[in-house]
């Protein structure tokens, strides 16, 4: 069973072979005892899909505007080609509303202090593809010969609203017989089940996790998968410690309207500028819309959320277009559009590193500005007795690289493969023998990505002269080496 508000966990069900999906359907005991499920998950086998929020189709996207067109939601994710390939393989991607997703093939990143920049484009992927395939010919039978084209169509990533992906996964899972979707239902508690001798049970549940649901319903799980977020009750129940820290920052998100109306077939770019207070990113959505992710101090995040729409728009333009000293001044004094225009007229935008094709932000969708705290957390292990952690319950990462959901989807794929292997061998899916391979596969990989992202954030948050000089020099070196940029793009694309 899966209790799920987390897309990656729902995805794990589809990654199982059909014969094993059927094998995972649960049987219920007498009503006085807990219902027994092979797999239960917070945040997709009998399969109970439990979510505290409604998963009905209308929640797929944002509210409608005055003309009846549905606005884009402010919570979007950047899906790598590897993640999209996985979603296609499990049959979920075909349910995604394609008119509301946007692939991008390039990305420009620049230093807000020095103006040094890196321009990632499809040509860089082609250069590294040539190097990789040449090496593959020198090492017959190795994975080096794998073509870049096998991973995707040249895109860096694809933007998709979280609600769009969630609805697609729910639509997919609802097509299977024996699946029970329990949305709008909150888990009230987790406890160990009763002993066979004391409760007249045919099965000893004393070491099984039992979920308490509204209406005195109880569910016992042979395996409980926790994908219930950074403050995971499943992780707490399993007494699995985690290490990490808060960044004392918030990620401000919003849906923006740009001055450029893009043709659906035109190539799109993402943009990211590293400011001393944190990175700000503009990621493309269809048409003239984009999603904003601005990592900044908690105080500034509160200030930004309090601004009227016109002043918020001016603040976003300033953060991309002005010197960092001017950005700081405008965010603490005035963000009037006329002040922005005057300061921009006095700024050498090319020396600033601003891309020549960078769009101007014309407005912000009403009600779309929000924020969330930024933190890094990593569980000491992903598994316990009849417990597996996945996604944010296992690891929380800074959003500057947009890898959070992608890591979670990779977790889901790995866990599903491990369960399929164990079930084919006749293993108890809640046993350490079945689960250990999942933790061994994912913990080190996730830890490496988290470490790199954390260090990149700290390097770009430093304002000391030697650090600024060193990172700027690094930018310029990488910008001049196409095959290095291509390698970075391949890594970021999964």
Predicted region positions:
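C-terminal helical "tail/cap" subdomain of flavin- and related membrane-associated enzymes
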Residues: 417-494
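Glycine-rich phosphate/pyrophosphate-binding beta-alpha loops
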Residues: 279, 372-379, 394-406, 444, ...
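Conserved N-terminal helical subregion
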Residues: 99-238, 243-255
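N-terminal glycine-rich dinucleotide-binding loop that anchors FAD/FMN and/or NAD(P) in oxidoreductases
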Residues: 64-98
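Conserved FAD-binding catalytic core of PHBH/FMO-like flavoproteins
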Residues: 87, 210-218, 222-358, 366-369
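FAD-binding beta-loop-beta segment adjacent to the flavin cofactor pocket
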Residues: 371-389, 447-448, 458, 464-468
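Glycine-rich FAD pyrophosphate-binding loop
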Residues: 36-75
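N-terminal mitochondrial targeting presequence
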Residues: 1-33
């Amino acid at each position: 069973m899966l209790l799920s508000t987390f897309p990656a966990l729902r995805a794990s069900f589809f990654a199982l072979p059909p014969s094993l999906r059927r094998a995972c359907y649960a049987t219920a005991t007498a009503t006085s005892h807990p219902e027994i499920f092979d797999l239960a998950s917070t945040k997709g086998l009998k399969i109970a899909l439990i979510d505290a929020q409604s998963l009905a189709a209308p929640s797929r996207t944002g509210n409608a505007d005055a003309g009846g067109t549905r606005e884009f939601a402010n919570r979007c994710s950047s899906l790598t080609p590897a993640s999209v390939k996985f979603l296609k393989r499990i049959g979920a991607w075909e349910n995604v509303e394609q008119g509301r997703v946007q692939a991008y093939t390039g990305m420009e990143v620049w230093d807000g202090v020095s103006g040094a920049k890196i321009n990632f484009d499809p040509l860089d992927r082609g250069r590294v593809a040539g190097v990789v395939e040449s090496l593959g010919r020198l090492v017959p039978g190795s994975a080096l010969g794998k073509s870049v084209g096998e991973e995707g169509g040249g895109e860096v990533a694809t933007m998709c609203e979280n609600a769009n992906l969630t609805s697609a996964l729910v639509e997919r899972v609802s097509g299977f017989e024996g699946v029970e979707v329990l949305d709008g239902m909150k888990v009230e508690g987790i406890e160990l089940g009763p002993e066979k001798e004391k409760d007249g049970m045919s099965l000893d549940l004393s070491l099984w996790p039992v979920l308490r649901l509204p209406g005195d319903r109880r569910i016992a799980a042979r395996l409980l998968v926790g994908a219930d977020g950074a403050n995971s009750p499943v992780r707490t129940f399993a007494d699995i410690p985690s290490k990490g820290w808060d960044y004392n920052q918030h990620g401000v998100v919003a849906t923006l309207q740009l001055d450029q109306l893009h043709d659906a077939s035109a190539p799109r770019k993402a943009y990211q500028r590293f400011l001393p207070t944190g990175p700000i990113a503009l990621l493309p959505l269809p048409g003239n819309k984009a999603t904003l992710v601005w990592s900044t101090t908690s105080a500034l995040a509160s200030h930004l959320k309090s601004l009227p729409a016109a002043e918020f728009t001016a603040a976003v333009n300033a953060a991309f277009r002005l010197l960092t000293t001017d950005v700081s001044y405008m965010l603490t004094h005035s963000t009037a559009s006329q002040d922005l225009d005057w300061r921009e007229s006095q700024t050498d935008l090319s020396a600033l590193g601003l891309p020549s094709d960078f769009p101007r932000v014309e407005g912000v969708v009403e009600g779309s500005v929000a924020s969330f705290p930024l933190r890094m957390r990593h569980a000491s292990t992903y598994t316990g007795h009849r417990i597996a952690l996945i996604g944010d319950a296992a690891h929380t990462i800074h959003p500057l690289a947009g890898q959070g959901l992608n890591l979670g989807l990779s977790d889901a794929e790995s866990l599903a493969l491990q369960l399929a292997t164990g079930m084919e061998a006749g293993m108890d899916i809640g046993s350490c023998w079945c689960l250990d391979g999942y933790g061994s596969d994912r913990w080190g990989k996730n830890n490496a990505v988290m470490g790199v992202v954390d260090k990149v954030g700290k390097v770009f948050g430093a304002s000391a002269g030697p650090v600024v000089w060193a990172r700027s020099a690094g930018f310029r070196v990488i910008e001049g080496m196409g095959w290095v940029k291509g390698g970075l793009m391949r890594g970021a694309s999964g």
